Amino acid sequence: MSIQNPYCLPICMLIAMLSAGPLCLSGQNLDNLGSSLRSEGLNITGNINLSNQTYWASGIAPRRDGMMTMVRAGLNFRFLGFSAPFSMVFSDQNANFNLPSYTFLGISPRYKWATLHAGDRNMNFSKYTMSGISFRGAGLELNPGKLQAAFFYGRLNRALANDLSAAGNLNDFYQRRGMGARIGYGDQNSAYYLNFFSARDRSDVFPDTELGERLRPTENMVLSVQARQRIGKRLSLHGELAHSVYNQDQNAQPVADEDINFINRMLGLFRPNQSLISGQAYNIGLQYNLGQTGLQGSYERIDRGYRTLGALFFNNDTENITAGINRTFFKNTLQVFVNGGLERVNLDDSEREATDRVIASVNLSYRPNDRWFLSGMYGNFRNDTKLRVRTDFTVPVDSIFLAQVNQSANITALRQLGTTERPASLQFLLNHQRAGNVVNDSVVNSAQSRFTTASLSFTAGSPTTGLQWNTGLTLNFIELGAIRSRSFAPIVGINKSLLNNALTLNFNSGLSFFRQSGTEDNKVFNLHLGGNYQLRNSHRLGLSAMHIRRFGSPDALRNFHEWYGQLNYGYNFGGKIGGGSSNNQN
């Protein structure tokens, strides 16, 4: 990390944690502490779930291991207002298919407005800084009223193996350490936040990969400002502005301070080198409500050089403009939403391809009464790409205009039938997608595709007898260039509850017929049987089996059988230790 003292933030976090303790205790009425200890006691709740899956195949090579085990557990302690949830997930190694074993352990004790995270946890700051990733370390969240603060420090997820065919923990070859902070003030009408994120790879352990390229240790730092403001009763605004600096190689030659502006040095916290790339990201949006009508609009721009290691995936070099309107009619029984937008990439004109995307959609939903529901959607997605050939910059640019047009539409109709004692329903679904390429205003016939799916299902049952059954039919039509394919599949299912709903049995089966280019190809039959049994009040036992058979193909090598099995066991427990009364459960 380019912070002068990498332990600065963890030390500050520790001080904050120690400071929070006396503040929390001071909120207690010390005169009544003894009586609270005697009356409340220690409450413990938790659960454990065990799962074992089996697999066997005939006629084809196995597509997964024959045996796999998973354990999930949770435990929560409550004492004098403190709450400490603990979670654990374990899976054994899938050796034949190179899937690693893994174990996740974490605990997040909470007291009033303070939460401490330890172990494998995740915290979200903002889209541009840290979102959607987990860490192994420590974190702290403080929410005393309108003030909000969050801190974390730990090892971030990294998935790289020197031998890509090896199974095991893929994080062992090198580590990425990260830290971050989020401080803000807000309520329902307005909020303002300052976000900080920093990450650095260990440079002492960094192996070559099979690809033959030495991956370089990187480092990254991001600062962002977020705001949300409500203006009057109808208008609200929100936005975020972020700046990122990213050294692609920690070992690159340093640069003089006078060659780097103050912003790229991140107020002196970051030390750029010759591999530096930097950029900005910002967005602004508004919402305006006019009774039954609502208006929305947003603008977002992310530079090519913007990077954050606090997200699993981040799309840069893009600009988005979107607008939408929604309206209700006929006493809120009809809802209409229209949305459209434009996306542009290659903002700095540094690539040979310039792409523009146009998106428009219309959504309708209509519920005239309790028995009918209708909905529909139409979307148009257009992707325009200009391919340019720059062989001689002294002559005009040669170019080819390529457009991809994708259209989709779906319709849903639901009709409630029967009575309260014997409910039933009929549902119809239709989905159609069409795509095609246009090159210099000419349609490419070989690149056109159409996908259509239609399904009709009927469900009925009797709550008093615990019986429910369903049947249906699904049709699929596919046109992909010169390939024509269609299939239809009737299905049936039955669920039955017994022994005062303690035992639930289910049966599902279907037969699919496939035909391609006018010739019958094959059929697929599937059968699923399962059951769940509630043992006493806290134990659950589940067993299921599924068989898949593909047959009817002239090529015998394409016919096969597969069997899947799964055994589940679950246990919930809870009770009180001490206190005025005991309420233990087994």
Where does each model-flagged region fall?
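Cleavable N-terminal export/targeting peptides
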Residues: 1-37, 570-586
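Transmembrane beta-strand segments of Gram-negative outer membrane beta-barrel proteins
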Residues: 30-59, 77-86, 109-118, 147-149, ...
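Long, low-hydrophobicity, solvent-exposed regions enriched in small/turn-prone and acidic residues
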Residues: 33-96, 229-230, 367, 417-419, ...
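Exposed, low-structure sequence patches enriched in small/polar residues
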Residues: 64-72, 100, 181-183, 192, ...
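Outer-membrane beta-barrel translocator/receptor signature
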Residues: 65-71, 79-84, 98-103, 112-113, ...
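Outer membrane beta-barrel
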Residues: 89-156, 288, 294-295, 301-305
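The substrate-binding groove and active-site-proximal loops of carbohydrate-active enzymes
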Residues: 122-126, 214, 271
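Hydrophobic, small-residue-rich alpha-helical packing segments that form membrane-like cores
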Residues: 153, 158, 162-219, 231
